[in-house]
C-alpha cells in the first residue's frame, strides 16, 4: 500500500473528484431509498412507485457514468506503474473486466430494472429473493462485479491510482452491504409472514 501511495497525488483534483463520486453514489441512493420507504414522497410526486423507481434508477445510472468518468480521469492524470505495464498483467485486467461484466449483466437480468434499482424500497417486490445465478455463487454480485470491473480497468491502465480507488470502491460497497442487507432480509421476511397469514 505504501508503494502504491508513492505514485498517487491525493490532492490532485481529478483524484479528489473520483473519491467524492465513489463515496457519494451509494450514500445518495441509500438515503433517497430509505426516505422513499418511510414517506412514499417520490411515489406520490411521480404518480406511481414504478415511475418513481425508474426515475431514481435513471439518476443512479447517470451518477455511475459520472463516477466511472472521474475514476478514469484520475487514473489518466497520474503516473503508471512500470511493474504493471506488461502484456501478462494487461490480460489479467481484461479477464477481470470480463468476469465483472458477466456478474453485473447477469445480476441485472436476474433482478430486472426495479430489482436492481431499489424497487423493494418502493414496495415493488419479487415473489421471493433471487437465488439463481449469479446469486447462487456470490452474494451481492452486482457490487462485486462492479468492483472487478474497476480493478480490471485499473490494471489495464497499469494505474496505482486506479488500484487505490478500487480499494475505496470495495470498502464503500462493504459498508453499503452492511446497511442494505438486513433491510432487504426484513422486507422479504415481512412479505413471507403476510403471505403465511393470508393462507
UniProtKB/Swiss-Prot annotation:
Lumenal side: 1-12, 34-45, 115-157
Entry keyword Lipid metabolism: yes
Key word Zinc present: no
Reported regulation of activity: The first methylation is rate-limiting.
Pfam families, per database record: PEMT
Gene Ontology molecular function: phosphatidyl-N-methylethanolamine N-methyltransferase activity; phosphatidylethanolamine N-methyltransferase activity
Pathway noted in the entry: Phospholipid metabolism; phosphatidylcholine biosynthesis
Cytoplasmic side: 67-93, 179-199
Cited PROSITE patterns: SAM_PEMT_PEM2
Compartments, as annotated in UniProt: Endoplasmic reticulum membrane; Mitochondrion membrane
Binding site for S-adenosyl-L-methionine: 98-100, 180-181
Keyword entries, A-Z: Endoplasmic reticulum, Lipid biosynthesis, Lipid metabolism, Membrane, Methyltransferase, Mitochondrion, Phospholipid biosynthesis, Phospholipid metabolism, S-adenosyl-L-methionine, Transferase, Transmembrane, Transmembrane helix
Listed InterPro entries: PEMT/MFAP, Phopholipid_MeTrfase
Transmembrane spans: 46-66, 94-114, 158-178
Catalytic activity, reaction form: a 1,2-diacyl-sn-glycero-3-phospho-N-methylethanolamine + S-adenosyl-L-methionine = a 1,2-diacyl-sn-glycero-3-phospho-N,N-dimethylethanolamine + S-adenosyl-L-homocysteine + H(+); a 1,2-diacyl-sn-glycero-3-phospho-N,N-dimethylethanolamine + S-adenosyl-L-methionine = a 1,2-diacyl-sn-glycero-3-phosphocholine + S-adenosyl-L-homocysteine + H(+); a 1,2-diacyl-sn-glycero-3-phosphoethanolamine + S-adenosyl-L-methionine = a 1,2-diacyl-sn-glycero-3-phospho-N-methylethanolamine + S-adenosyl-L-homocysteine + H(+); 1,2-di-(9Z-octadecenoyl)-sn-glycero-3-phospho-N-methylethanolamine + S-adenosyl-L-methionine = 1,2-di-(9Z-octadecenoyl)-sn-glycero-3-phospho-N,N-dimethylethanolamine + S-adenosyl-L-homocysteine + H(+)
Topology versus the membrane: Multi-pass membrane protein
HAMAP family: PLMT (MF_03216)
Family statement: Belongs to the class VI-like SAM-binding methyltransferase superfamily. PEMT/PEM2 methyltransferase family.
Protein name: Phosphatidylethanolamine N-methyltransferase
Source organism of the structure: Bos taurus
Amino acid at each position: 500500500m505504501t508503494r502504491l501511495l508513492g505514485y498517487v497525488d491525493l490532492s490532485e483534483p481529478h483524484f479528489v473528484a473520483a473519491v467524492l463520486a465513489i463515496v457519494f453514489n451509494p450514500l445518495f441512493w441509500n438515503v433517497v431509498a430509505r426516505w422513499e420507504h418511510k414517506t412514499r414522497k417520490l411515489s406520490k410526486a411521480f404518480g406511481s412507485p414504478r415511475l418513481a423507481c425508474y426515475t431514481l434508477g435513471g439518476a443512479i445510472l447517470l451518477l455511475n457514468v459520472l463516477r466511472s468518468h472521474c475514476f478514469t480521469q484520475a487514473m489518466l492524470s497520474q503516473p503508471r506503474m512500470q511493474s504493471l505495464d506488461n502484456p501478462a498483467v494487461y490480460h489479467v485486467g481484461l479477464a477481470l473486466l470480463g468476469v465483472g461484466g458477466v456478474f453485473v449483466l447477469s445480476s441485472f437480468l436476474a433482478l430486472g430494472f426495479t430489482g436492481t434499482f431499489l424497487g423493494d424500497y418502493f414496495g415493488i417486490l419479487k415473489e421471493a429473493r433471487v437465488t439463481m445465478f449469479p446469486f447462487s455463487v456470490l452474494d451481492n454480485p452486482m457490487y462485486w462485479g462492479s468492483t472487478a470491473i474497476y480493478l480490471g480497468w485499473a490494471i489495464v491502465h497499469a494505474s496505482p491510482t486506479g488500484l487505490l480507488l478500487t480499494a475505496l470502491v470495495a470498502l464503500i460497497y462493504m459498508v453499503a452491504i452492511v446497511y442494505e442487507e438486513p433491510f432487504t432480509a426484513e422486507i422479504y421476511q415481512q412479505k413471507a409472514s403476510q403471505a403465511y397469514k393470508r393462507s
